[in-house]
């Protein structure tokens, strides 16, 4: 049996709803919206009535600040809900289920959540659609049904046989290009041609669709830095300062690799990014660098003062950018940006104790109506990304000592989300 409860802040404590109301009226331009209420909806399966009643006042709500109800409040309003996409991690639901299990000391129940919006005023269909577009990011969530489901357990379909891409090894270039578009692959035509040659000459068979999808995923820019490894065959620079820096890079290549090897070695953005450290290492100016088979983050030997005595410690540094993930899913993208930074020194047994966030965004005051097609409003992006970063950092207990927010029209094309951490290990 599925049990349902709605939770809403008490009157006078509904700051989030008032803030969103003001934003929708002034930023989105829905002037006919007179009032707005926000409720959290919990659906629970696998919990008896007595335990459910206990959970209402201990897990789902705080009686001092929340009101609860078994049904949506009556009134002349437009109601709709937003829930995570199937398969999307629902932290609120997961935390609630864990808390209930701690409370009952029994099997963990199934919990599903949704955010319910109640809109008041003489709204047109266009007004309601504008509100939905602003609060609903289709990359991570969808509109939820207001009906009570009969069960919450996901239906498990029997998987079909894995499809073989018959004729793949015999496709000509035009055929590969058609397949590339049909499957919506991240790799380009040259990548797919390389994959075709491998299956034709080495495996001597056609690949399965799963194999192509797996290779496409791990061949993507996010996994193997495809862009940074691209060979720069022709470089044309108009800015004198940038040209001077590029000339220094060319000189550094000859110093590190030697003139003959430098001429044969491809120029890449990755090489440009790492050449400075290679030069310093070659000159013997980096004796403190720790090099081992276990390279999780940049590690430097330091003499740390512990109780007034020097001890040999490793100071670890790690940075990460999550530009595109944050662009399409601001909360999760920014959260996993700092999360990825933390993970690497943490896996080196370091205590991560300090962080930094650099972010670049377009003008958040830009009217929502001017948002480019396929993109989120800059205001929404900036605010939600900040919430995602701070959420992860606060939960793990990490102090972020420096935050810099850069606003420039160039970041409309692609958001900048850069996190960095330092940690230490004895």
Where are the regions a protein language model picked out?
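Core nucleic-acid recognition elements
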Residues: 1-426
